[in-house]
Regions:
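Residues that form generic nucleotide/phosphate-binding pockets
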Residues: 56-59, 70, 84, 191, ...
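Charge-dense, low-complexity intrinsically disordered segments
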Residues: 36-47, 54-72, 98-101, 178, ...
């Protein structure tokens, strides 16, 4: 799909789906506003996954190689899925999201390790796409034989569809999954209220300042003591930095291979 076709497709879609057209406009406007922000540096140093886990759980000695081995089959299954959709162009109904439209391997392994260690009962995430990171969370819940993941996502572009949201997730893992269709603006507060206290909140939806701050502020009161707030792409704007500074929290920053992205980790400790 060339740029002109993509543009015309968006106009037509917005005309017949005005609600999604509003979402598209809000995304564009917020992204444009964020582009004018001066991104402030984080004073805390980023760490590799093993150091992050050691910082959180000093009594454990979790190795990345062991995590890779434990998730080897899942990783292989997800790679097979990605290879199948690579033959289609982006954007299209068959490939509605870019192939690299997911959090990094280190982030996925961290999610898996965290869920294996703390054995959460309730997790809420925003943003699913193909469901790669979702699969790593669900793999841990499947092995734990307990826990529920609530995932919120929507399709608001003409080449997106509910069918492709979470399409990479292996069927056997879906017993621990509850998908909620809609934007986080519409659905997050309702999901949090019905879920009660949660162990983990993960932001991985629209990475704009306004949306991220909204999600952090909404989720934080619902997170249990010793629970976690996690966020991908914290260098997109200053929301994560401002949030933990205002709350007087010490973040843990997971470094990623490309060094242009960071995964943010906040542990809630009230006592």
């Amino acid at each position: 799909m060339n740029k002109l076709s993509k543009y015309l497709s968006l106009i037509k879609f917005s005309f017949f789906q005005p609600k999604h057209g509003v979402e598209l406009f809000q995304t564009y406007r917020q992204t444009n506003e964020d582009s004018k922000q001066t991104i402030l540096p984080h004073e805390h140093s980023a760490m590799e996954i093993e150091k992050c886990l050691k910082s959180l759980f000093p009594e454990l000695d979790t190795k990345k190689d062991n995590l890779l081995d434990q998730t080897k089959k899942l990783g292989s299954d997800l790679q097979t899925f990605l290879e199948k959709i690579k033959k289609f162009e982006f954007p299209s109904k068959q490939q509605p999201y870019p192939i690299d439209y997911s959090i990094s391997e280190s982030s996925r392994l961290f999610l898996y390790a965290l869920c294996k260690i703390i054995k959460p009962k309730t997790i809420v995430e925003t943003g699913v796409a193909y469901g790669l990171s979702t699969s790593y969370i669900l793999q841990a819940l499947y092995e734990n034989k307990t826990g529920t993941l609530y995932s919120i996502d929507s399709e608001f572009k003409p080449w997106e569809s509910e069918l492709m949201i979470g399409s990479a997730i292996p069927d056997e893992l879906k017993t621990h999954w509850k998908f909620v269709k809609g934007s986080s603006t519409e659905k997050l507060n309702g999901v949090l209220e019905s879920a009660g206290k949660i162990d983990i909140f993960l932001h991985d939806s629209m990475h704009t300042y306004k949306n991220m701050i909204f999600e952090f502020e909404s989720a934080w009161p619902h997170i249990k003591n010793n629970g976690f707030l996690l966020s991908d792409d914290i260098l997109e704007n200053n929301s994560f930095l401002e949030f933990y500074t205002r709350k007087n929290l010490k973040p843990i920053l997971l470094s990623l291979l490309d060094q242009e992205h960071l995964f943010g980790i906040l542990k809630k400790s009230e006592f």
